[in-house]
Amino acid sequence: MFSVFGLSIPISATELLLASATFCLVFWVVRAWQPRVPKGLKSPPGPWSWPLIGHVLTLGKSPHLALSRLSQRYGDVLQIRIGCTPVLVLSGLDTIRQALVRQGDDFKGRPDLYSFTLVADGQSMTFNPDSGPVWAARRRLAQNALKSFSIASDPASSSSCYLEEHVSKESEYLIGKFQELMAGSGRFDPYRYVVVSVANVICAMCFGRRYDHESQVLLSVVGLSNEFGAVAASGNPADFIPILRYLPNTALDDFKDLNRRFYIFMQKMLKEHYKTFEKGRIRDITDSLIEHCQGKRLDENANIQLSDEKIVNVVMDLFGAGFDTVTTAISWSLMYLVTSPSVQKKIQEELDTVIGSARQPRLSDRPRLPYLEAFILETFRHSSFLPFTIPHSTTRDTSLNGFYIPKGRCVFVNQWQINHDQKLWDDPSAFWPERFLTADGTINKALSEKVILFGLGKRKCIGETIARWEVFLFLAILLQQVEFRVTPGVKVDMTPVYGLTMKHAHCEHFQAHMRS
């Protein structure tokens, strides 16, 4: 028995020695597990965490808000744990630009998360951990294919490019559909129709054809995308707590099945293209990729080929880049229009002055419609419906703001925090498109570049430019002809629901009135 501070403790010398040895072993393991920090650098700060689960409870149902609050206490570079996995969290515009742009090679990796291996058979450019020359070459090819079939023009069309042609047709369909619904029930939920039209645009770009809106092919694509968003929104704890992969997990099983079905669908579309492919007559993005596969190198300085089985993965990435983001952006835009009728009126006055009613808006009108552009920027900023980028990881040992970051560290980039940072924005909680306009009514370019929604640097969304064009065209054409309202007395719920893309509650009380 030992006496400590006058208290008798019933413990033998052997037990005390064993307890001391256990403590020393645990202490040594913990110290060995932590990376050695080079002299002159520090480890990122962060809050105390629970054993095994880490900061899961701290993150709660709104991780973007929880991590924004933590950044106010610990700074722009902080570290948390999800399960037993350390995660670096970046906030602040300057810090994120430093990491993703100036030190882009250090932060261009993707973490080797289990859920990422389930997307596109583990070969997705977007989710794959590979960041070497093969990945870079495929990314360039995908960007070029997407761009060429967006800005290229159809000789038989009066539109300036394929994207303009497809969006114009879908916008006209939506206007007609909204009037049909108004003649019936007098109200509707625009999301269910917008999502199908946006899917039809990307189908036309990727597969060379638009579908009837009741087509089972088109509706199955929409259904798969909606399922992906719903399942991804719940997150995959198995990414950070590996033992969960081997326990009953309905959400994970659903995610596996969803990706399998989407992969099978894309393979079917690719097989149909191979049957009808004619060299020299390129109809769409898939044909363009097949042509490269059959004889062109992706990189003239390296022997890098695009195999047949990889084409389906590239098409899946492009489809994802051009679908959910655009749908969500338009959906949020419509919500802001009905909750800010004075803003909608200003946009329509600008359209009337610049374009009139004799013709449809075109992409070339974009520089002459600054208020509409300011509205889109404010929608992106205020909603921040992509609160985080897809997680990054470090490709080598590096440092940031004086903190040591080891190779392979998972990195969360908090875009929501930037878009609501009081250091950057006056009254960030207010929806105010005018903040982006200069005294002479033009777009404040420096301020517009502070809105971060599509990521930055080498992993920036490949569909960003096309997404911005598409959102602009849909809104310009719709607002030229239609005034949106909600049923009198109905309060619109703008509360965002956290997910891969944050959605608002569906509103079934929209009304669309034709403008005179």
Swiss-Prot record:
It catalyses: an organic molecule + reduced [NADPH--hemoprotein reductase] + O2 = an alcohol + oxidized [NADPH--hemoprotein reductase] + H2O + H(+); estrone + reduced [NADPH--hemoprotein reductase] + O2 = 2-hydroxyestrone + oxidized [NADPH--hemoprotein reductase] + H2O + H(+); estrone + reduced [NADPH--hemoprotein reductase] + O2 = 4-hydroxyestrone + oxidized [NADPH--hemoprotein reductase] + H2O + H(+); estrone + reduced [NADPH--hemoprotein reductase] + O2 = 6alpha-hydroxyestrone + oxidized [NADPH--hemoprotein reductase] + H2O + H(+). Heme binds at C461. Substrate binds at F228. GO terms for biological process: estrogen metabolic process; fatty acid metabolic process; hormone biosynthetic process; progesterone metabolic process; retinol metabolic process; steroid biosynthetic process. GO terms for molecular function: estrogen 16-alpha-hydroxylase activity; estrogen 2-hydroxylase activity; heme binding; Hsp70 protein binding; Hsp90 protein binding; hydroperoxy icosatetraenoate dehydratase activity; iron ion binding; steroid 17-alpha-monooxygenase activity. It is found in: Endoplasmic reticulum membrane; Mitochondrion inner membrane; Microsome membrane; Cytoplasm. Residues 33-44 are annotated as: Mitochondrial targeting signal. Pfam families: p450 (PF00067). Glycans are attached at S71. It is a peripheral membrane protein. Its cofactor is heme. PROSITE patterns: CYTOCHROME_P450. Its EC number is 1.14.14.1, 4.2.1.152. Keywords: Cytoplasm, Endoplasmic reticulum, Glycoprotein, Heme, Iron, Lipid biosynthesis, Lipid metabolism, Lyase, Membrane, Metal-binding, Microsome, Mitochondrion, Mitochondrion inner membrane, Monooxygenase, Oxidoreductase, Steroid biosynthesis. Pathway: Steroid hormone biosynthesis; Lipid metabolism; fatty acid metabolism; Cofactor metabolism; retinol metabolism. Interacts with cytosolic chaperones HSP70 and HSP90; this interaction is required for initial targeting to mitochondria. Interacts (via mitochondrial targeting signal) with TOMM40 (via N-terminus); this interaction is required for translocation across the mitochondrial outer membrane. Belongs to the cytochrome P450 family. A cytochrome P450 monooxygenase involved in the metabolism of various endogenous substrates, including fatty acids, steroid hormones and vitamins. Mechanistically, uses molecular oxygen inserting one oxygen atom into a substrate, and reducing the second into a water molecule, with two electrons provided by NADPH via cytochrome P450 reductase (CPR; NADPH-ferrihemoprotein reductase). Catalyzes the hydroxylation of carbon-hydrogen bonds. This is Cytochrome P450 1A1. The lineage of its organism: Eukaryota, Metazoa, Chordata, Craniata, Vertebrata. The gene is CYP1A1.
